[in-house]
């Protein structure tokens, strides 16, 4: 039977956690200390107190661990939805959703900063992270009750991913507990996103087959459309 290596420093990982959760936590701890390109499964296994076989059973690559972390953040944000915001305008709902996301990320801020720096140096990593972010942003749009399905939803997701990346840069340098700079950047970004969404709606009027399913109008009734100024 393979021995499980002793866990390296970084604070104890709760024994009740699954191997998958231990690996994700170990990855984020290591990311706070070094570049993602320097992190391998050997280091992750040692930090998590697991074997390489345990790691291989859960993940195929280091980027897959990052993807699993992103998915877990999505889950936390979606689980923490506030029904009191249901009557708010879409832009306000999306603002609340994205601020919940940043709150969920706060514990691993140093790791996120490290990952962002690596992405600026590595185009392939940047492309992979963009794909993860677009998928996450489609879930965030859905959480805000803003359409995120189909080609139009993909465009909204990509637009929101770009906006989110910009806000994330502000957040990484915002040491104010109240996150005043971050909230201001997000508010400005969502205002720009609403204008961009209006242009997207106009485009879909002329290219309905690409933006809307066959047999359905490319534009919602006027009164309904005005209630959904999508952010991206």
Label for each model-derived stretch:
Residues 2-5, 173-232:
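C-terminal peripheral helix-coil segments that are non-catalytic and often amphipathic
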Residues 22, 30-68:
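Helix-turn-helix
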Residues 40, 113-115, 128, 149, ...:
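Short, hydrophobic secondary-structure boundary micro-motifs
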Residues 81-114, 121, 131:
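Hydrophobic alpha-helical connector segments
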Residues 123-146, 154-166, 184:
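Amphipathic alpha-helical packing segments from all-alpha helical-bundle domains
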């Amino acid at each position: 039977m393979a021995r499980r290596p002793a866990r390296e420093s970084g604070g104890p990982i709760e024994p009740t956690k699954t191997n998958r959760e231990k690996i994700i936590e170990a990855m984020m701890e290591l990311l706070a200390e070094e570049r993602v390109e320097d992190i391998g499964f050997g280091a992750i296994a040692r930090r998590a107190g697991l074997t390489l076989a345990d790691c291989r059973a859960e993940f195929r690559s280091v980027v897959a661990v990052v993807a699993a972390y992103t998915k877990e953040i999505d889950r936390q944000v979606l689980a923490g939805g506030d029904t009191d915001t249901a009557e708010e305008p879409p832009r306000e709902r999306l603002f609340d959703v994205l601020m919940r996301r940043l709150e969920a990320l706060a514990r691993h801020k140093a790791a996120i900063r490290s990952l962002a720096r690596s992405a600026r140096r590595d185009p392939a990593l940047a492309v992979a992270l963009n794909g993860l972010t677009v998928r996450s942003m489609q879930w965030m749009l859905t959480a805000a009750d803003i359409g995120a399905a189909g080609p139009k939803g993909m465009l909204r997701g990509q637009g929101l991913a770009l906006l989110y990346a910009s806000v994330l840069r502000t957040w990484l340098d915002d040491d104010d507990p109240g996150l005043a700079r971050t909230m201001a950047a997000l508010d400005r970004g969502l205002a720009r996103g609403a204008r961009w969404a209006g242009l997207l709606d106009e485009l879909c009027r002329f290219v309905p087959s690409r933006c809307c399913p066959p047999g359905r109008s490319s534009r919602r009734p006027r009164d309904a459309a005005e209630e959904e100024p999508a952010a991206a």
